[in-house]
Structures are given as C-alpha cells and as structure tokens.
C-alpha cells in the first residue's frame, strides 16, 4: 500500500514541478513581453522595479518651423539631482554658490525626493553654459547639469501638429514587425499621426541608476548615461510654418473671439502653409471629448461655404460666355424669382452682381450651365482645386501615396439626380444645398487663381532631416493632376475678386484701405442649425494679396455663428495688417 501511495505522491510532485516549469517558461521565454490579457511587458517591469531613471529625451522625432526652430518642445539646461544624495555627504554649498539657489532649498528638495528630478520643476531653473561646466566639473555623484527636452504646454498649430500618447494595442497593430517598447509614444492625430513612422524613437536619452528595495543605490553610486547609438536619429520634420506669422494669426484669431473656425495662410509661390489655426483649442485633460473642443482640425474638415462658391460658378460662366457686360440680372428677386424682402439691388450687370453677391444672378447662371452640361459645376470645382485632395501626396521610400494631411475632399452634389434638378442647382449656385469644401481647399482655390490657374498640392512639410540637419528626403512642389483654368479665365477672376473690394457697395469694401491691396470673396453659408431661435451661419472671407504681385492666400472663417456676430472680414483685415508689418520689418 505504501508503494502505491509513494508513487501517487511522486506523480503529484512531478505534475506540480511540470506546472511550475511551464509557468516559468511562460514568464521567462514565451510571454516575456505580452504577459496576461493586460499585455504586461515583464522585461520592462523588471528593469523599472530595480532601477530609477531620469528621461532627458524620449527619442521621438521633432517638428520644426521653416527656420529650423522647434515647434513642440524646448530643450532646457537644467540641474538634475538624484534622491540617493540624502544618504551621503555632498557639496551642496558649492552647487548653491554656482546656481544661486540656497543650500537649504537644495537639500530640502533632495530630502523629499523619491526619484531623480530637475530642480525647480515644473518650471526648472535654467543654467548657463559656464554654470553647467562648473557643476559637471565637480563630478559629484548624483548631480548633473544636462539638457532636458520639455514639451510646450501651449503648442502653436496644435491641431495641425497633432497629439501623441501611449497606446500599446495601436502600436502593435500599426507596427507588428517592429521591436518597440510598450511605452513608445505614437501619433494619434494630425502630422504626428501622418509622419508617425518617421518619428518613432531609436531609443531614449536618460540617466539611470539601480536601486535596492529601499530605493538606495544597488551598485554603489554610479549613474549611467544612456543614449541611442545611431547619431542620425531621431529625425526632424521641417514644416513650412513661419514662427512669427503662426504666432500672430493665433493671437488674432483669439482676439476676435473665434469660438469655432480659424484661419489658413498660404505662400502662393511655393503653395506652402505659413500659418494654420483651428478653434476651439484642444482640451489637454480630455482631448477627444468633442464637447470640450476635440482634436479635429476644422481647417481640414469640409464646411458649408456659401457665396464663396460663386467664384466657381463665375469661372464656368466666363468660359461658357454667359457674362456679357450688357446683360442685366434682377437682383431684387430671390433665387425662385419672388421679390426679395431683404435685398432690393435692382438690375445689375454680372461684375456688379459678383461684387454685391447677388443670389439670383448665380442661381440663374447655374441653371443655364446645367442645361449645357450637368457636370460643369463639379468639373470647375476640380479645376479650381476646391474639391478632391489638395494636400501633398506622393510616393516616398516604401510609402505609396503618402499623405501629409488627413483632409476631407469636399463635394458639390450628392447624387446624379440633384445635378439635373433646377431647385437644387439654384441652391448649389449660391454655395448652399450639398456644397462643401475645407478652408484649406478654399485658400488653395485663391492661390490657384492668383497664380493664373496653375493648381498645386499644398505642403505643410518641406523635408525630413536627420538629427545633424542633413536632408533625409524632400517634399518637392507638385502640381495637382487634371484640367486647369485658362490664364484668361484666371485673369478675369482676378479682376472680379478685386471688384468685390473696390466697389463702393462690394461685400469686401471694408478691406479697401489696407496696406496691401486685397482681392477676394465673402461668403455666408446657412448651416440649417439654430441656437435657440437664432439660425447659425458660416461666415467667410477668402482672398489673396498684394493684388498686383500675389504673395499670400488667406482664408478666415467663423463657423456656426449667429447673424449678429461679426463677419470674418475684420479678422482678415487685421491679419493682412500684421503681415504687412512683418514683411516691412524685415526690409
């Protein structure tokens, strides 16, 4: 009997050992980086448990203004102190003399510290180069003067640049073949998302020391400096943004109380974005809550553009010879032919109709174009780069059709039947019904007209640079494929857009006295939404300047505004003034 019991006992012991061995194999070999449903990385957890570190740079790539200055971060020379200093006699007096910080303050900060820190955080004291050299020359263990990268609390162009975050599931799905730490930051929106694979870190720069269970040094007081071995990484994305103009436009958008909307400024020569601002601002505590602002860049989302679309109707009307100067339109009537209770403009020619934005004129023209060919308005919207992708797209390395921007494409009609319906076509002719376009596309339309009809892709980045500032790749200027306006039609549009401003009754007459001569078009899109009993509108002004030698295309828009809210023209005017001052301060 005892033999049988012994055998059973031995079998149980062997089974237990096998279970333990299987568990140990799972922990140390099979699931070291993806343990349990929570996907715990045991290697990282082990290192974290027995060491403390001060991250100086996450290693993720950076975004730069066109002049090379950083947009999203700032490197500061700071004083790093390690908590094990409290257990040793260190020369706090000498550090005090060099930094100007009291000896008591230094020792008190170390005493309450549980991990390495930059003295003075969240607003650390910034050291001079001589101070850094003196501190490091003392060679005090646990005391370092180093450069540490800080992300700016208020990022300019925050919607355009986008945000990052830790999301291991997204990381594994996006890069299944890459060996990346579970704590690797990934781009979630904007350019951070578009350029994410370029920006992935090669490793962190950090100060590390090993600790025992009490937090004391495990292997003496040696602190290791760890940095990526590749001197070319991380790479930087050089944007086309101008630091001064971006700052000015941000300030003016806020000064004008734009709650929803913003502005887009394009360099016409290179067709590059110089400034882009979207409001509401991103709520850092809850960025994806749309009620608190959300992360959507409204300058890249399709919007109702109202009378701005009359520019497209006009281009088609010019080519199909529907703008005879002797022709008169009844601008005291609505688009249905009924007497207009609000606007009694009388009989106007086409040029004056455009300047005063007469709805009946453009509803009539749109219906006449429909009789010639129902596709004309859609075709001309494409010719003016108002619809379709307008951001830079191209093949680079192993990326096919790499897109710098995540943008809506806009639309004119939703169905073939709508193109043939007189009522829908009349509404389309004045930029209502289903007409949608992004503010970026509207700005690009103005740039296209100012260039004489050549339509180009809009760039927000000019190149990807290695860490040492040498070029990895360039995003060259590229034209958009497809039909274009003739130079003659573009010239006629230029004159009509200028008439909007110089005509004493033009909708842009408030812009007559600006230091730069402006050409452009206003728009008031009916959203179909209300605030209480008040209808809400999208208020636009889109144009370019200087008129004789076009340099800038600008769109300002106030979205979802009540009728008594200011138009977008005052913001447009103030931006033009500041750009004029900027240009002449450099001369």
What are these regions (language model features)?
Residues 41, 49, 296-297, 359:
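Asparagine-centered polar/low-complexity signal
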Residues 1-285, 378-383, 559-587:
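Periplasmic/cell-envelope proteins involved in peptidoglycan metabolism and beta-lactam response
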Residues 302:
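Extracytoplasmic Gram-positive cell-surface binding/anchoring modules and repeats
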